[in-house]
Amino acid sequence: MKVVFMGTPDFSVGTLEALVEAGYEITGVVTQPDKPKGRGKQMMPTPVKEAAEKHGLPVYQPRRVRDAEAIEEIRKMEPDVIVVVAFGQIIPKEILDMPKYGCINVHASLLPAYRGAAPIQWAVMNGDEVSGVTTVSYTHLTLPT
């Protein structure tokens, strides 16, 4: 089964590692572009890019995943399934419709609580004693607000 993985922060790396260890054919890893960090503003890769490169996986870093060029590059990866974990951009319908078996999203909260960005931080700031992870299958996603 051909898997395209889309993720960016440390939270995403565990899922990517599990897919590699399970022996799935990962035809592409899509992550955010490198960004300047630290006092010297050196360009730094995302944690997902570092993990993908460690395993010799092909990495694609579009500035905007909804651009025609990005959609075509992901289409070339021929996904049977797309796994999304904290990617950080709205994924267009053209991409969500590509895989034969659909898309799976892993979100770091018990949805609908803390939908959108920074769900772990919001749970901590609000003093929640219970939190969790939600896994959902979808065919068209808009980034919740």
Role assignments for model-derived ranges:
Residues M1-L141:
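One-carbon transfer enzymes
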